[in-house]
Amino acid sequence: MSVIKEYRTVSEVVGPLMIVDQVAGVHFNELVEIQLHDGSKRQGQVLEVQEDKAMVQLFEGSSGINLEKAKVRFTGRPLELPVSEDMVGRIFNGMGKPIDGGPAILPEKYLDIDGQAINPVARDYPDEFIQTGISAIDHLNTLVRGQKLPVFSGSGLPHKELAAQIARQATVLNSDENFAVVFAAMGITFEEAEFFMNDLRETGAIDRSVLFINLANDPAIERIATPRIALTAAEYLAYEKDMHVLVIMTDMTNYCEALREVSAARREVPGRRGYPGYLYTNLSTLYERAGRLVGKKGSVTQIPILSMPEDDITHPIPDLTGYITEGQIILSRDLYNSGYRPPINVLPSLSRLKDKGSGEGKTRGDHAATMNQLFAAYAQGKQAKELAVVLGESALSETDKLYVRFTDRFEQEYINQGFQTNRTIEESLDLGWELLSILPRTELKRIKDDMIDQYLPQTKEEER
């Protein structure tokens, strides 16, 4: 049983950090309760212990703390989340407390928010398709169970609409299996929080979702705990309740800013652009909690969303995220300004596991071939359009003009599906074939003849 120690030896408060002197038997990551002179309580966590001094990070701000009158209790246990299957359909704040007006959760157990280290040998390979209803993802950058696939966005781009669309549309094709969405929002505005809650309520998706919302006016330090709390809930539902869980985390840039704030308060030597040198390690403790385990039916799949400062993909946050995760979905400002929704730039986007979740028995036998052909045709069409800008359309061959026509229709019909359209993978594949029918059959070099005979719309081919 944990021994609770109480001290009145607070010596310093700096930003979100508090220093407690003359402590003994205190451990890293230990949960701390602070009672103020007016009787109110706040929570914190031990960040560092040196000899008889403990550094505590405060989750609920440091304003109003009287150094002489504050009582600090070290609980002897880590920060834990009370979990239960009743969490599904509920909305919580960034620290896991209900904010939807419903009753408190009756927990089946309490789980450490930092999770458990997973033995690499115990991991199962991700290879089962998740349908998001978005053609540019399902067909061209396939998401599989257990994968971590981030979305790289920018300021002003509609990543919140994309996140809400994925949250309400995502599903596994085998309807007999339980599916849930855990949504973690960090540093979002009140309007954005209302948007997410109302969207999920109106569509009924809230019934299979768990929301954790940290607002922009909540303490920044709370943002460090929010994704860990959300992932703890996801792991519980996946590995103990056999559910397939999709975790959407937005905005990871706000999380990293909170890390930088704590690092600056600790007077640490800054790394790239002022972020702490351990940013890569810290992000990996979140992203690596995705996956499947041998012997477990459930899975945890992650879609972290981050806004790239100044649309800079070389910024430390997207740069390090790309090293850890298995691909990226990139939103394009040019497509957005042209009115395309969602503005997914498919050429630089990538899902490193897309070939594992596609094919006969998972999606359809023509998935991989049409994906490769669409990529090649779109790239060639973009090159032809650039050539026309420099030399004029008269410099284009008849085949080049067909590629330009294909590219225009690909963006207008395939990418520009809107945020309310939910396409099945079969609809995405059929639309891909319809667009490929614009091109001469001799240009479809990445697809076998028997597959072309089976799927290419005959009427279009005969018209040519």
Swiss-Prot record:
It comes from the Bacteria. One of its GO terms (biological process) is proton motive force-driven plasma membrane ATP synthesis. Coiled coil: none annotated. The keyword Acetylation does not apply. InterPro entries: ATP-synt_VA_C (IPR055190), ATPase_a/bsu_AS (IPR020003), ATPase_F1/V1/A1_a/bsu_N (IPR004100), ATPase_F1/V1/A1_a/bsu_nucl-bd (IPR000194), P-loop_NTPase (IPR027417), V-ATPase_su_B/beta (IPR022879). One of its GO terms (molecular function) is proton-transporting ATP synthase activity, rotational mechanism. CDD domains: ATP-synt_V_A-type_beta_C (cd18112), ATP-synt_V_A-type_beta_N (cd18118), V_A-ATPase_B (cd01135). Keywords: ATP synthesis, Hydrogen ion transport, Ion transport, Transport. HAMAP family: ATP_synth_B_arch. Belongs to the ATPase alpha/beta chains family. Produces ATP from ADP in the presence of a proton gradient across the membrane. The V-type beta chain is a regulatory subunit. This is V-type ATP synthase beta chain. The gene is atpB.
